Amino acid sequence: MADRFSRFNEDRDFQGNHFDQYEEGHLEIEQASLDKPIESDNIGHRLLQKHGWKLGQGLGKSLQGRTDPIPIVVKYDVMGMGRMEMELDYAEDATERRRVLEVEKEDTEELRQKYKDYVDKEKAIAKALEDLRANFYCELCDKQYQKHQEFDNHINSYDHAHKQRLKDLKQREFARNVSSRSRKDEKKQEKALRRLHELAEQRKQAECAPGSGPMFRPTTVAVDEDGGEEDKDESSTNSGASAVSSCGFGADFSTDKGGSFTSVQITNTTGLSQAPGLASQGISFGIKNNLGPPLQKLGVSFSFAKKAPVKLESIASVFKDHAEEGSSEDGTKADEKSSDQGVQKVGDTDGTGNLDGKKEDEDPQDGGSLASTLSKLKRMKREEGTGATEPEYYHYIPPAHCKVKPNFPFLLFMRASEQMEGDHSAHSKSAPENRKSSSPKPQGCSKTAASPGAERTVSEASELQKEAAVAGPSEPGGKTETKKGSGGGEDEQSVESRETSESPMCESNPKDISQATPATKAGQGPKHPTGPFFPVLSKDESTALQWPSELLIFTKAEPSISYSCNPLYFDFKLSRNKDAKAKGTEKPKDVAGSSKDHLQSLDPREPNKSQEEEQDVVLSSEGRVDEPASGAACSSLNKQEPGGSHMSETEDTGRSHPSKKEPSGKSHRHKKKKKHKKSSKHKRKHKADTEEKSSKAESGEKSKKRKKRKRKKNKSSAAADSERGPKSEPPGSGSPAPPRRRRRAQDDSQRRSLPAEEGNSGKKDDGGGGSSCQDHSGRKHKGEPPTSSCQRRANTKHSSRSSHRSQPSSGDEDSDDASSHRLHQKSPSQYSEEEEEEEEEEEEEDEDSGSEHSRSRSRSGHRHSSHRSSRRSYSSSSDASSDQSCYSRQHSYSDDSYSDYSDRSRRHSKRSHDSDDSDYTSSKHRSKRHKYSSSDDDYSLSCSQSRSRSRSHTRERSRSRGRSRSSSCSRSRSKRRSRSTTAHSWQRSRSYSRDRSRSTRSPSQRSGSRKGSWGHESPEERRSGRRDFIRSKIYRSQSPHYFQSGRGEGPGKKEDGRGDDSKGAGLPSQNSNTGTGRGSESDCSPEDKNSVTARLLLEKIQSRKVERKPNVCEEVLATPNKAGLKYKNPPQGYFGPKLPPSLGNKPVLPMIGKLPATRKSNKKCEESGLERGEEQEHSEPEEGSPRSSDAPFGHQFSEEAAGPLSDPPPEEPKSEEATADHSVAPLGTPAHTDCYPGDPAISHNYLPDPSDGDTLESLDSGSQPGPVESSLLPIAPDLEHFPNYAPPSGEPSIESTDGTEDASLAPLESQPITFTPEEMEKYSKLQQAAQQHIQQQLLAKQVKAFPASTALAPATPALQPIHIQQPATASATSITTVQHAILQHHAAAAAAAIGIHPHPHPQPLAQVHHIPQPHLTPISLSHLTHSIIPGHPATFLASHPIHIIPASAIHPGPFTFHPVPHAALYPTLLAPRPAAAAATALHLHPLLHPIFSGQDLQHPPSHGT
């Protein structure tokens, strides 16, 4: 019976009443009750009886207990025991109180008084307490103590004493800083003034230096105050006065001191006319006379952003006229500061350009540059005035969001006739950074200036001025330029331009150029003032300020709207450094076409970028001075400069004819430009998007651009060298600068190096070679994705100039350009050989300089390719132009990518490459160039394709290295090349090549480039490539450049470095770098930085881990970075309609289970890419392929992740032609696939979108979307390879797939999943979580999370990478294919999970992967797609079927791929395989995302699927 009442059966109701619950079977439930006596059967009853108790007796000693039950009355008191009493008490109290209150009412007065007294007393007490407490309050520590003891203890405490000491210290420090700052400011102003005067004097002298052209164009508007005012007035009134004032820059720079800058009225009339053989017009009138008639007086008003009033005032004063002087006392200060800045800038540039800038290199550089800018601006204004058009001006105050305060303190909107617009264009060119070159005319003018070769945009002039200002004193720079120019007619012209630009008389030079340009630039639209200063009408319209041309950006709109930034805010050094970054980023914005867009784009970023771009542009413009080079340079500028829109147009026009004739010169300048083009590239891209879309003469434009770019690079080298020189070597390298210039002249490689240094601020200035290269790379990556591609080409070209590349990158670049020129002139085989040689040199150099050299070399190859294909590299340069249209950008990217790859390819096989280039040029130019700046697009596509190709090559090489890498690579490249011959094929092959290159940039690029003769991949190349790649990777990961350039172009740069190191692999790296790196640099700079840091660590670890792996890792890393970074601000159309609008800013997640989150993706990509690369490398080596094979494959995978994205460029071309939107998406999508596995929808959108190219280019140029696309593009080509990929042996397959890519890749490419940064973040987190949980909950999580992940986009990227796997693998050897397949398998798994492949692709992965179909059993995710990725079925619909290669196929078997049941593969991808499925589902698959080293390829096939 005991169990009957077991307590555990007792339940209590909510009121606490308990009910005994008996288990079943206890039918007689006995309720013990106190109401009745205990029954006999009760336990207690029996117990009591045992004790002698008898029923009826009371308990107790004397039986006194009651016998009857105790009646229990349960009192359910609602309030509990005693509660009622309490309540009643309360009630009574309340009643009493109420009574009291009633009494109170009666006794009101008395009570009130009492109450009042009481209150007063309370208050007094409180006050006394407060007073007392106030004594115990420590203000220093912000602590209130209640007791004296507490307070005393505190006062005597260490905490308090420490705070006191800290405070005192801070105060002292602050006082010191303030005093030192004020002193510094004073000194700076004095220096600036001094510099301005010096510059003015130099300009005067420079006028007398016809040899160098006005070596020292009056950068500063230093004219008598009367003259200055007169000048301004003249600018307003007549062109004649304008010319004089422009030359003289009559506007005095009033300093804060109230003194006006000593007007060194340098009559630029002579100086300008003295521009080396430019025009005899001399002064600004050169442009004015040319542009003067058409240039109506454009009223330009500068709206000053609401920044520091002093700064604005300073600016106002800097540009204010003498008339404005009194009113601009603050302006005087600003003027002084601005002048100082201008001087500094000029000095910087000049220092770079010449020894003259040595002193100015530091502050005066900025000041000098500013001064030159001011001079140009003033001149422009004067010319504007000369135009005598009613001053119509728009004030634009940069949006609050404009982060680039220095860049756009205000905008000058010049609304005037084409004439002024032309002037503006020139200025825009000069100041593309600041002024968005929305107006085609300005750009045209600027470009035109470059185009005629005679006209140098003001920016160019300004840059040149700065550079020349430095170079002018030491004509060596000019001579160097001349020497360089002597190298080739175009080069000579470039030199001429450069010299002119270099000379402080840049002002006159631009004018001369303008004059010379008229013919070339005849139909180029408005001529923007090319003087150092542009006369800008102040808001009151009474004063014409001399605005630094560099700060002016002219829109291409009929009424040229000039954007300008406060020169004081215009950090020319920064501008140059950031020019590359911002330029690329903002170019796309520029393409947006709206000045506002540009402003916004430029404003936040362009200020620095603009400044840099401006200088770059100046260089570019200078480069444009050459008539032949002018076109290319112009084109380069066009794409490079924010004001590149009009420039792009002009460049397109000018470049089309001069392009061919001056491939070398242009290339040379273009190379230089390429550097600057980094930032400008995006701008230019957008411009090109708008302008170059219809630019049939893309080749010419490209060439021009190249030339200009070269020039720009030269100038930029000099300027940037000076600029960055201060960082690496004092900008005082005015003396070094000319040598550098000389070196540049001597070696384009050095030129490239210099721009690199510029880009990297001498981060890697450790050695002229590697450091410069790295710098170049960094710069490239930083702001000049397009430039990057150009540089890449330059590097590729410079591959032929490898040894030079060891020299400063800037010189390297120039050298590359020159080399490109030479190579271009050479027979393809010669070119190839030279490129090969140089590539090998570069390889060695790359080994030395790692990423930078690699990049340089890669670029050199690209540039070679570019030059060979009508300056395809400059097409990349056109990136800014390509901002003209995403599509254009796509085209540009393809071109550039192709160039990248092509250069390598050319190194491999010139003829094939040439055909590729031609094909690309025709097809790509047709579809892309016109779509968006050919240069940019070329770059984008080129990067992508080159990367694909490189990647393919890398894969091939990986395999080749493992097995017959060289042959395979060669074959793949050959095939790719031959494919490239066809536009689509070419694009695809390029995309793929780029993909591949990206993947295998290190091995493949080297291999590819080195294989200038297709099969010519020397063991040294391979070894060097591998070593370089590893080294590059390690170096990059360890070097600040890795972060700087590895950040923006960081991954790309890194990859480029390693890619350049190993040309084959380097190409993807480079392209990836350029494509993504730039994107990352510009767009995801911080994110990329983090990613780069993470990647750096990972790379360091894994590079140590797997020295071979570095290729893969780096590629992978670079790809994620690129991919992630690139999409930061891709044009909307880039991704196409499908691409989510935010995709532009969305980091791209590698679709291949690269598992890169945006930045984290990048990081993860890096990690996973590295690890995956490791895995693949492990696997591949296990399979019998060397690390190179593995690394390339790893890269390929990562790059495949990015590669297929890159691959899409080929598809993109076809799509481009067919559907701009769709084509772009494929291009971008593959990249996205690489970078954004997370967003299937995005990936698809990205891939098919015609904007893809743009985005790529944008990524590349703008926010470096191009690089991202590069990253992505490589994936696309791989993916594209899927369809047409017949599984030849890896390479050929890739080649064929390359061709097929164009047609087939689009779907897959379109599928690549792009994610917004949020998505990427989510994806990265998801991936991390997944990876962490994958092994724990592989099946459950994979199955459950796989779709979720896919939805999140982690899985999809993994899946998509699988398609990527096809082309890359096909291109690569079987192992690479297998690895690619594995990677793609992961991608496919992710895609399968994500449903990336809505429709099985006609050509199964096996074709691409060259893996037995059983292994690649295509996993058609079309069914999965919708369920997994419900959001974007279309995204996946276009994607190729996910061909998953079973891990067994990819894993250590001798490359024999054991057929794995589709179910095995697919399920493995999805969920069946615990680790693999989970990893795949989460994109954390070790293979896909070797983030966890432990998960290296060692993962069993199950994992490897």
Swiss-Prot record:
GO biological process, one term: mRNA splicing, via spliceosome
One GO MF term attached to the UniProt entry: zinc ion binding
PTM-bearing positions, type Phosphoserine: 648, 733, 735, 753, 915, 918, 985, 1013, 1018, 1037, 1039, 1085, 1179
Annotated ranges, domain G-patch: 40-86
UniProt keyword terms in alphabetical order: Acetylation, Coiled coil, Isopeptide bond, Metal-binding, Phosphoprotein, Ubl conjugation, Zinc, Zinc-finger
Coiled coil: 89-124
UniProt feature, compositional bias: Low complexity: 872-900
Residue location of crosslink Glycyl lysine isopeptide (Lys-Gly) (interchain with G-Cter in SUMO2): 311, 573, 1109
SMART domains recorded: G_patch
Location of the region described as Disordered in the Swiss-Prot/TrEMBL record: 166-244, 322-393, 419-537, 575-1304
Acidic residues bias (residue ranges): 223-233, 832-849
Zinc finger (C2H2-type): 136-160
Keyword field contains Ubl conjugation: yes
InterPro entries noted in UniProt: G_patch_dom, ZnF-G_patch_domain, Znf_C2H2_sf, Znf_C2H2_type
Extent of Basic and acidic residues compositional bias: 166-175, 182-206, 322-339, 421-436, 575-612, 648-665, 688-702, 745-767, 1017-1031, 1050-1063, 1097-1112, 1163-1185, 1211-1220
Transmembrane segments: none
Modified residues (N6-acetyllysine): 479
Compositional bias annotation for Basic residues: 666-687, 703-715, 794-804, 856-871, 923-932
Comp. bias regions, Polar residues: 437-449
Database matches in Pfam families: G-patch
PROSITE patterns to which the protein is assigned, alphabetical: G_PATCH (PS50174), ZINC_FINGER_C2H2_1 (PS00028), ZINC_FINGER_C2H2_2 (PS50157)
Protein's recorded name: G patch domain-containing protein 8
Organism the protein comes from: Mus musculus (Mouse)
Name of the gene: Gpatch8
